Curated annotation (Swiss-Prot):
Post-translational modification: Activated by phosphorylation.
Cofactor(s), by name: Mg(2+)
Reactions catalysed, as given in the entry: alpha-D-glucosamine 1-phosphate = D-glucosamine 6-phosphate
Binding site for Mg(2+): 101, 240, 242, 244
Name of the protein in its database record: Phosphoglucosamine mutase
Stated family: Belongs to the phosphohexose mutase family.
GO biological process terms on file: carbohydrate metabolic process; peptidoglycan biosynthetic process; UDP-N-acetylglucosamine biosynthetic process
UniProt-annotated catalytic positions: 101
Length: 451
């Protein structure tokens, strides 16, 4: 059965427009409470990023859960992976994150974690949607839920992150610029790196409810690149608004994306005595990553885009390490979901253990030029099947002749079609991507023209 509200990463949209409205969130809290809360364990954790709309949505969800007879423990602004960790360690029935990740403040969303700190499976999301179709009926007065706050949540998570870094190593002597995207990591990430010995120069760590991801964070690294050069830093670290993504910048100011970081972590794991199972990327992962992992003697598998699909493939194939180019990195022996801080610490572990710069570590992977063009489209318009587009893709694949890849993929979070092309020649890749993007625009105009 097709889901009506849940996408690849929960429920997301523009604040004030369905489903990101207070009345829907009230109903969602009630529906989720009825599905997720177990007998004898009826508490959920609710955390959020720093968007101003988080207050409104938090209050609505809190009321909905209470109406279902579920107790609510409010965490305040916390990274998404922190909520997954705390859900598991505090033995809650579920964790709820109010965030739209890397999107601007005008957007917001909801994602859930099960009691073991993992994202919900399709069956559970469908069960919540089934409850949403029922009228909201509060529990009897004596069984209504209560709400309370957990004030020591940041400290608990900081200590968890520090424990993921080898005790015998230190970050002393490293100067790090840390871009918190004016998001949920602002009050925890600098503390983690500082307490492990690094000199920390914080960036975008002053959220006002409106500046989350605004020209900062993992999607906008130019400010971080400039700051690394200005401060003569050893590396820069950038998170997205909810802290489940990370990209890094080397001492020269060059970006190392999720593919490069995944390679560095895999190589360090092999140096530490091996890595169980395959490394899992996605269909968008650079071909250079696949080749680099192969040189380490490890199999490389590709999942659909979305960290939940990377997670599913890791579980199915017996792997522990995977990730996306965007910086969602998963290390199942340390976390149950993508964790930007923990992932960055593993890269810093490699730097400290090998006494090499980030640039030297990243140079071990030969990246192929890759271009991605996001073409705005209307949802539900089948542009990929239009002859103009299929012909353009066929022509591109013929020209690349097995030396590269072409991939068209609708975004799961935005109304765009992502056109990805990679190959050995930058100019050829750019021209090919623009040609296909032009074909997509032409097909979309044809399919949406008034009849």
């Amino acid at each position: 059965m097709k889901k009506e509200y849940f996408g690849t990463d929960g429920i997301r949209g523009t604040v004030g427009e369905p489903p990101i409205t207070p009345d829907f969130m009230l109903h969602l809290g009630w529906a989720a409470g009825r599905v997720l809360a177990r007998a004898g364990q009826s508490s959920v954790l609710v955390g959020k990023d720093t968007r101003i709309s988080g207050y409104m949505l938090e209050s609505a969800l809190e009321s909905g859960f209470a109406a279902a007879g579920v107790n609510v423990k409010l965490l305040g602004p916390m990274p998404t992976p922190a909520i997954a960790y705390l859900t598991r360690t505090l033995r809650a029935a579920a964790g709820v994150v109010i965030s739209a990740s890397h999107n601007p403040h005008e957007d917001n969303g909801i994602k859930f974690f099960s009691d073991d700190g993992e994202k919900l499976d399709d069956a559970t999301e469908l069960a919540i949607e089934a409850e949403l179709r029922q009228p909201l009926k509060p529990a009897p007065s004596a069984r209504l839920g209560k709400a309370s706050r957990i004030n020591d949540a940041p400290g608990r998570y900081i200590e968890f992150c520090k424990r993921s870094f080898p005790y015998e190593l230190s970050l002393r002597g490293l100067r790090l610029v840390v871009d918190c995207a004016n998001g949920a990591t602002y009050h925890v990430a600098p503390a983690v790196f500082h307490e492990l010995g690094a000199e920390v120069i914080p960036l975008a760590d002053d959220p006002d409810g409106l500046n989350i991801n605004a020209d900062c964070g993992s999607l906008h690294p130019k400010g971080l690149q400039a700051a690394v050069r200005e401060h003569d830093a050893d590396a820069g670290i950038a998170f997205d608004g909810d802290g489940d993504r990370v990209i890094m910048v080397d001492h020269r100011g060059e970006v190392v994306d999720g593919d490069g970081l995944l390679y560095i972590i895999a190589r360090q794991r092999m140096a530490n005595g091996g890595l169980a199972g395959p490394v899992v990327g996605t269909v968008m992962s650079n071909l250079g990553l696949e080749q680099g992992i192969g040189r380490l003697g490890l199999p490389f598998l590709r999942a659909k885009v979305g960290d939940r699909y990377v997670m599913e493939m890791l579980r199915r194939e017996g792997g522990i390490l995977g990730g996306e180019s965007s910086g969602h990195l998963i290390c199942l022996d340390r976390t149950t979901t993508g964790d930007g801080i923990v992932s960055a610490l593993q890269v810093l572990e490699a730097m400290a253990a090998q006494e090499r710069t980030l640039a030297e570590l990243a140079d071990g992977m030969d990246r192929l030029p890759q271009i991605m063009v996001n073409v705005p489209i209307s949802r539900g318009v089948p542009v990929q099947d239009h002859a103009t587009v299929t012909d353009a893709v066929r022509d591109a694949e013929t020209r690349l002749a097995g030396r590269g890849r072409v991939l068209l993929r609708p975004s799961g979070t935005e109304p765009v079609l992502r056109v990805m092309v990679e190959g050995p020649d930058q100019a050829e890749v750019s021209a090919t991507a623009e040609a296909i993007a032009g074909a997509v625009r032409e097909a979309h105009a044809t399919l949406t023209a008034p009849r």
